[in-house]
Amino acid sequence: GKNEGVTFIGTNNKNGAELAANFICDKTPKGADVAILTGMESQSTALLRRDGAIKGLKACGLNIVATQTAEWDTAKARSVTESILVKNPNIKAIFGSNDNMALGAIQALEDAGMNDVVVVGFDATPDAATSILAGKLTATIAQFSYNMGAYGVKYALALANGEKIDANIDTGTQLVTTKNANDFK
């Protein structure tokens, strides 16, 4: 719900997922089959990332054949991806709403001998950065926890000084690929 007078300072998860989707669109032929692994459906972060991915993937003409929860978990993502691959053997890309799920998807793809599928995660964990540099994970989306703290202090001081601040303050996201993955190890 809406809380009057409360400000959210953090990642715009929908925009971050759209950034991931746009990258997938650039790397995947129009009309190709793609899948989305979501977090827990009861959590706003999962829903926002799912919705952002759907918006971005549909906008460029990709065919979303599966949108399934793996509850942020690597082992569940591996199992869910295995099931998706049985029904959709021509899958060309997978968006994992966090890096754990993206890495689980990679395990399932490797088991199936499919190493040409674009896989993008979210969070830019050190394991994800290592996987990108190893040529497995294609990309991930970074969010900036430092900004969350710094902006929190900045805007708390602004409020204390009687200033008005926005209800939502985005702390930023960034695409992480082989070009910048070393910065996130």
Q: Which role fits each region the language model picked out?
A:
Residues 1-185:
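A residue-level marker of the well-folded mature domains of exported/periplasmic proteins
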